[in-house]
């Protein structure tokens, strides 16, 4: 499968990687599962925003199930898989659980914490590169795939794939925080760890 990504999306993907590294890590040292989940959640959330739903009328964190997410969400997972295949990240199909569950270390941020921390800047990346919300979701999925590739040596490609697939679903089916709201991680829980 060939990746059909525009140059603007490729540039935006680099900005998304920099955003994740800058907001979640110290330098470029970040907790892999948290970085992957956060990038995937942003991708899914951008896709959710592309559907044009009135998100302000629902409580942030509420599940928002839709046919649109069911139809368009799998494209994000396909993009992830295609990128990993093109970059020779081998995956054992028996260890892939996709969007149903992921095993390994849990991300250190909840879905709402991830979105609150990143969504305003993610929307700014989309605007800066003149991308539609769906194009931005694809660019963020590409960024997620890059992070999975970079972390595969330490956590395994399958763990990265599973965390990402679950994050795409979380982002595309969760009402995001309102842009003016900020959800802070609990002070007692570290939000990163050095590899």
Label every PLM stretch briefly.
Residues 1-195:
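Solvent-exposed interaction surfaces and binding hotspots enriched for charged
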């Amino acid at each position: 499968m060939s990746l059909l990504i525009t140059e603007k999306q490729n540039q935006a993907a680099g900005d998304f990687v920099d955003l994740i590294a800058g907001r979640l890590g110290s330098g470029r040292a970040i907790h892999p599962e948290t970085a992957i989940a956060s990038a995937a959640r942003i991708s899914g959330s951008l896709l959710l925003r592309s559907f044009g739903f009135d998100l302000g009328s629902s409580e942030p964190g509420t599940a928002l199930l839709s046919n649109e997410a069911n139809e368009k969400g799998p494209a994000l997972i396909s993009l992830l898989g295609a990128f990993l295949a093109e970059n020779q990240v081998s995956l054992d199909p028996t260890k892939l659980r996709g969007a149903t569950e992921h095993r390994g270390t849990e991300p250190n941020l909840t879905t709402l914490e991830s979105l609150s921390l990143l969504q305003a800047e993610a929307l700014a990346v989309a605007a800066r590169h003149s991308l539609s919300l769906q194009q931005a979701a694809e660019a963020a999925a590409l960024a997620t795939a890059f992070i999975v590739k970079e972390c595969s040596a330490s956590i395994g490609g399958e763990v990265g794939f599973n965390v990402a697939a679950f994050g795409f679903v979380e982002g595309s089916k969760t009402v995001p925080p309102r842009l003016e709201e900020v959800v802070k991680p609990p002070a007692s829980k570290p939000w990163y760890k050095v590899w």
